[in-house]
Amino acid sequence: MERIRLDLSKTGSSVASYGETAEKFNALLDNGTGRGSDFLGWVHLPSSITEEELNAVEAAATILRERCDYVINVGIGGSYLGARAVIEALQNSFEAYRSDRENPVILYAGNNIGEDYLSELLQFLRDKRFGIIYISKSGTTTEPAIAFRLLKGLLESQVGREDARERIVAVTDSAKGALRRMADEEGYRSFVIPDNVGGRFSVLTPVGLLPVAVAGFDIRQLVRGAADMQAMTASDIPFSDNPALRYAAARNALYAEGKKIEILANFHPKMHYIGEWWKQLFGESEGKEEKGIFTATVDLTTDLHSMGQWMQEGERTIFETVISVENQDTCLTIPSDSADLDGLNFLAGKRVDEVNKMAELGTRLAHVDGGVPNIRIILPQLDAYYIGQLFYFFEKAVGVSGYMLGVNPFDQPGVEGYKNNMFALLNKPGYETESAAMAGRLKEC
C-alpha cells in the first residue's frame, strides 16, 4: 500500500538543520523517556491493539446497531472529535436522510451546553429507538455529564431501566471516577480509556473505535493504517525518510521565521472534522508557556469567499498546510448545455473533481506568490486506511514538534481556568472561597 506523502518544496525554508534534533526527540517518544512520559501510551498503540480488543468493540457495536436507529455519542474534545472526524469523512453526506441506510445515525451531545441544542435533540429522540455511548474518563466533565443525565432520563422513561442499560455503553477509566462507578452499579457495558493515553490522542482506543464501528466502518483498516504509519515514523527511520519529523521540523522552522499561524486547508467538505480534530491536537499540545503556533482551519473552496482575501493579502504571519486527496470514489461529469448561458461549456466533459483539483492548485500557487509558505500532505484516497495513517502522522509530528518548541505536549493546564471560574459562579460545593472572591470581583465591574 502507498503511504501519505509530504511536500515541503514550497515552504521557502530549509529543514535539514533540524534533522538531528527531531531524531533525538523522536527517540524520546519511542523510548517513553520524554516530557509527559506518563501519557505516551499512544506511541505504540496501533501495533499493540489485539484481535480480542477489536472483536469486543465490534461485538458491542453490533448490539447497538441491532437495537438502535440513532446512537448518541456523548463527549467533548478528544472524547468525540476523532470519531466524528472519521465518521463524517467516510459516510454519505446525506446518510441521515437515506431511507435505505443499514446503520444507526450517529448524533452528538455533550460537546456544548447549548440549551436549544439539547432541548431539540431530546424532542427529536422522543419515541425513537436510540442508544448512548458516554465517553469520559472522569464522568464529571460538565458538558457531557449534563447531556448524559438528560439523555439517560429520556431513554429510561421510554424503554425502562432494564432495557436502557443494554443500550448504554460507557467508555471510561478502568477503576476510578464517577462514570466507572455508575457503569459498575448500573451494569452498563463498558470499555477502558488507557491511563497513559490523553484524550486528544485517544482516537485509536475504544473512544474512537466504538462509534466508528457502530457507524459501520472498518476499524481494522483504520488501525492498520495507523500501525503502518507508526512503522514509517519510528525512531529507526532517518529524518530524510520520516514524514512526521520533516513536518515537525518545517513547522518549527517557519515559527522561528515569525510565522505564528498555521492554517490547515482542505478541498473536500467531508474533511471538516479532520480539521477540527487537528486543531485540538496541535492547539492543546503546543499552546502553553506563551509559545505555540495558533491553529486555524479553512474549508475550501467555500472559505475562499470569506477568508481568501485575508490569506492572500493579510499580515504575513501565516503558513498553510493543505491536505490533498488524489483519487475520488465517485465520478461526476459536467454536462454540455446548448444555450451555454452560464458560460460553462468550456468545462463540459470534465469531472467535477478535476475542476476542484485545479482550484486547489491555483489557490496554492496564488498563496505562495502572495508570500504564504505552503506545506502539502497528499492522501492517495480518503478511506479508513489512509485516515489511520494521517491520524498517527499528526500525533507523532505534534509530539516531536512540541518537544522542539520546548513544551510538554501532553498536558493542558490552561483549560482549568474557565472551569474554575464557571464553578465559582455556579456556587459548586468546594468552591466557596472562589465564589466569594468572584462575587467581590463582579461588584467591581
Swiss-Prot record:
Gene3D superfamilies: Glucose-6-phosphate isomerase like protein, domain 1 (3.40.50.10490). It is an enzyme of class 5 (isomerase). Pathway: Carbohydrate biosynthesis; gluconeogenesis; Carbohydrate degradation; glycolysis; D-glyceraldehyde 3-phosphate and glycerone phosphate from D-glucose: step 2/4. It comes from Porphyromonas gingivalis (strain ATCC BAA-308 / W83). It is found in: Cytoplasm. The active site is at 284 (proton donor), 305, 419. Disulfide bonds: none annotated. This is Glucose-6-phosphate isomerase. GO terms for biological process: gluconeogenesis; glucose 6-phosphate metabolic process; glycolytic process. Keywords: Cytoplasm, Gluconeogenesis, Glycolysis, Isomerase.
